[in-house]
Amino acid sequence: MRTPTLARLPCRAVSGLTRSSARLQSQNFLTRRCASTAVLRSPTLAPAYQSALSKHFQQRRNASSTAAAVLEAAAANPDTLSQEAIIENLDPVEAARLSRVRNIGIAAHIDSGKTTCTERVLFYTGRIKAIHEVRGRDAVGAKMDSMDLEREKGITIQSAATFCDWVKKDAEGKEQKYHLNLIDTPGHIDFTIEVERALRVLDGAVMILCAVSGVQSQTITVDRQMRRYNVPRISFVNKMDRMGANPFKAVDQINKKLKIPAAAVQVPIGAEDEFEGVVDLLRMKAIYNRGPSGEELFETDEIPEKVKALAEERRQMLIETLADVDDEIAEIFLMEEVPTEDQIRQAIRRATINLKFTPVFMGSALANKSVQPMLDGVIDYLPNPSEVQNLALDKKRNEASVKLVPYNSLPMVGLAFKLEESNFGQLTYIRVYQGTLRKGSFVYNARNDKKVKIPRIVRMHSNEMEDVTEVGAGEICAVFGVECASGDTFTDGQLGYTMSSMFVPEPVISLSIKPKNNKDGANFSKAMARFQREDPTFRVTFDAESEQTLISGMGELHLEIYLERMRREYRVDCETGPPQVAYRETLGERVEFDHLLKKQSGGPGDYARVVGWMEPTGNLGENVFEEQIVGGSISEKFLFACEKGFHLSCDKGPLIGHKVLGTKMVINDGATHMTDSSEMAFKNATQQAFRKAFKESNPAVLEPIMKTVVTAPSEFQGDVIALLNKRNATINDSEVGVDEFTVYADCSLNGMFGISSHLRAATQGKGEYTMEFSHYERAPPHLQKDLIAKYQKAQADRHKK
């Protein structure tokens, strides 16, 4: 099939207007409007003007029909819109605009220097006038850490968006301006949803590693998230000025631990406190930073003698690694020729965008060294919006997969990826994948088909806003006045498209909570509603049995932050109970059942009989209900009631009242009564059969096992291992570095409560740890017995009341 052309479609470049330019545009519009009115009133000029106007609108209609034809062809056969076809056939003006846009995120392990690096990026691009440190003495804090809590604790809690322009010289020495949409993300696993939703809408990422620690636990998590959303990345080895810095250890760990081909594109000139700059391996030039804040770059062909041999060796390793992932370089390599600088650069770009390779840069953000070359790498090696494949599902065509085209003239498709409460109401962050989002326009929410107006569009600079009139394809913005949920798709109504949302992990820890003062009930409810809306991993439930409100999250720190925010932002002090683990229940073995529910009470009674079996599914994933009725002994509507009863039973297990995992129920026979059978009767019969069969199946209580990583100075290794053994942890691996060691272990969440204070005591405050949910496994028999007895006592006490 012939590839449909996208050329010649009219295009409107994205409006990144400042307030002054917006006012000027408005004045020009009024001037043109007055002039056009005068023309229309003129008897001699009106016909000519009307003819031109008619021709203009005809061109617009033709463009729209062409765009519609392109979409129609793509919907019928998505392969017609390959990324190559999109890039080749874009209108030159539109292609030029998109080629200068980069949507990137910065992600890494805790304290690898993400926010510090972002601060330098903003300074070197001219977005901010002065550098402020994360834990600076000036009490200002980094620009992207806008929350008071972030500045006090020195950590990033929520992702923050900004935009800036970076000027880079092309091959001919001409300066080209590139537009960057940048999102800084947290490093703590407790705030992993912030990383998830950022990577869901970004085209590329900078993965930062510590030059001393290399690949750490959260680096592996970030790598998994990048793979989930097919996000190309470049790597930046930060903290080259730290004692024990070894960037090539980090490169080796990317290859071995993350299993992605990687090679250095720079080598350091000096290290630790003698780190001076880097050597660019493509151009074989030494690069140094000068000026009070490293704002001036100095390049020279004179590479220091002490690193010449290393630079030659690493350049050859770069070419060899590329030969394994890129056909063009492989051919050159086999012919024993030397690729040119441009050939290497293009190969790195191809391999990076195709997720086959990551180039590794190095520097020190805190020391203001070698950040600008990393920015050049963002431009050179990360994709623009037209080079990334973004898919939507067409609900009008049985959810057929359709490629989205980052073209301003096509119908609008956008994804709401983050909600935030502000002084002006709900702020919704949207990535526009296709078409143009305009102020005052109407859009449709694909989830509920609601039509909403866009009253205001802003571009975010951390907690500051800049109003704009429109945002084009490939851009990120925020809008006010749009009620929606995180992950909702918006269209202009012409398309039935919906996009997949981001992955949301299940909470692993809960707390009972209530306001200390009953007068704070209204503010307490407002806070709970807002926090749930903003953060999908923060859950609020009400336990009818204990009559308690429970909040659930990703860890102790996660819930502590929300309790502190409630106190500061809503002036509500809360009482909390002890942490509660998200236990699960599961079936032990296959059990058959034949249950009859029969009640007579004078009038219509209840009658339902269900026959079948329950068995483990083989994995602790979703529960399965299956009907194998032959001969219609149970009608379809009663089977729906049986399925409902099964899922209700799985939501609250018979052992300790927690959710059930890995259970399958099959109903293959039953009986009904002409007058006494009902949907309610079959639902209740199924629940009763479930409870009885479950208890006969040798069931078990499951507890969450956490993947735990502890890092501390080497002299405390024995104390740390003893601390973990005391908590029944299974130690899987350990690494001993120059000054510190790392222990990798699996430990039950129940055993990890309160470890922070004990670890600080054991390591004189120098140890740190991270936890991430790994899997569920059977709890120890004594713990199962205690939990079941406690639950049964609570049930008995409740019935006495």
From Swiss-Prot:
Alphabetical list of Pfam families matching this protein: EFG_C, EFG_III, EFG_IV, GTP_EFTU, GTP_EFTU_D2
Keywords: Elongation factor, GTP-binding, Mitochondrion, Nucleotide-binding, Protein biosynthesis, Transit peptide
GO MF term set: GTP binding; GTPase activity; translation elongation factor activity
GO CC term (a single one): mitochondrion
Primary location class: mitochondrion
InterPro entries tied to this protein: EFG_II (IPR041095), EFG_III (IPR009022), EFG_III/V (IPR035647), EFG_IV (IPR047872), EFG_V-like (IPR000640), EFTu-like_2 (IPR004161), G_TR_CS (IPR031157), P-loop_NTPase (IPR027417)
Residue stretches making up the tr-type G domain: 99-386
Organism domain of life: Eukaryota
Family of this protein: Belongs to the TRAFAC class translation factor GTPase superfamily. Classic translation factor GTPase family. EF-G/EF-2 subfamily.
Record HAMAP family: EF_G_EF_2_B (MF_00054_B)
Record-given protein name: Elongation factor G, mitochondrial
Taxonomic lineage: Eukaryota, Fungi, Dikarya, Ascomycota, Pezizomycotina
